[in-house]
Amino acid sequence: MTADIGATLNRNSWLKDSIVKIRGKQVILAGDVGGTKCNLALFSEKGGTLIPVFKQRFASKEFAQFDLIVKEFSRQAADHLGSERIIAAGFGIAGPVINGRVRATNLPWVVETETLIRELAVPNVVLLNDLGATGHSLEHLPPEDFCVLNPGVPEAGGTRALLAAGTGLGQSILVWDGGRYRVVPSEGGHSDFAPHTEQQIELLRFMRRRYPQVSWELILSGRGFRTIHEFLAPNVKHASFEDPDADPAPEITRRGLDKSCRVCADTLDLWTAIYGAEAGNLAL
């Protein structure tokens, strides 16, 4: 995803100017800021493209604020920077960005460009919605980075939709304006879940006993795996269920894919069906 942000930097006017001016002693900082992890990387310019020179991953919930991650990254990167200096930075963050400020989704963070400018001592910092950043990167990704699920012929200039389940459920739309794609960030993952089958109706009833509003994101995210598993088999527990801070999604996924647990396999099937339904909704 840091590569996505790196590609996104090329699409921003002031950063395009900055990239043109990059020399051997200048770098750009890019980051993907999520509810579970943060990926940060330094990029240098080579042949008109950005090349990662140092990258690091941090567990988001281990830090009280994002600027503390930036501070720790800067400390670790010092040896790699040498006499090089950061001249610009861009970060994709899960949440709506308003006037250079974003209250991160699924984290108790408020991130502001002014704070990061002071912390990094750089003149230019840009914050983007994370799926907006991904949208900007699509035209820069090589063919091997795509996996075709249903073969077809894309319509030239056709509207594109992005859906990404993780700690939350990110969405964005890309609209062709006649010259290039314009990215429209969306918080559609927080809209109300609409069940399609009797089983999904029962799932909604199950979740309404826990939440006043059941959104697509509550299901189509990492926590949704555990919720669906508990709905299908409330008395079946796995080792990762015992630790309140653990994420059982990887274990459920692994055991569902290798068919070592029938409930896990059923959980994957139901989760995937709902994911497909929401992808169809977004396409409409």
Can you describe what each PLM-predicted range is?
Residues T36-K37, G92-V97, G168-S172, S191:
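Gly/Ser/Thr-rich beta-alpha loop segments that engage phosphate groups in nucleotides
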Residues E45-T49, T105-V110, L141-L149, W176-V184:
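A glycine- and small-aliphatic-rich helix-loop capping segment at beta-alpha/alpha-beta transitions
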Residues T8-R23, V126-R160:
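Conserved phosphate-binding catalytic cores of ATP/NTP-utilizing and phosphoryl-transfer enzymes
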Residues G31, N129, A165:
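Active-site flanking residues adjacent to catalytic metal/cofactor-binding acidic residues
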Residues Q56-F58, V148, S191:
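Generic detection of short hydrophobic beta-strand segments and adjacent strand-loop junctions
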Residues D79-L127, G132-D145, L162:
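Short beta-strand-loop/turn "lid" adjacent to the catalytic site in phosphate-handling enzymes
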Residues L131, A161, T167-K237:
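Glycine-rich phosphate-binding loop plus the immediately following alpha-helix
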Residues T2-R85, E202-L284:
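ATP-binding/phosphotransfer module of carbohydrate and carboxylate kinases, centering on a glycine-rich
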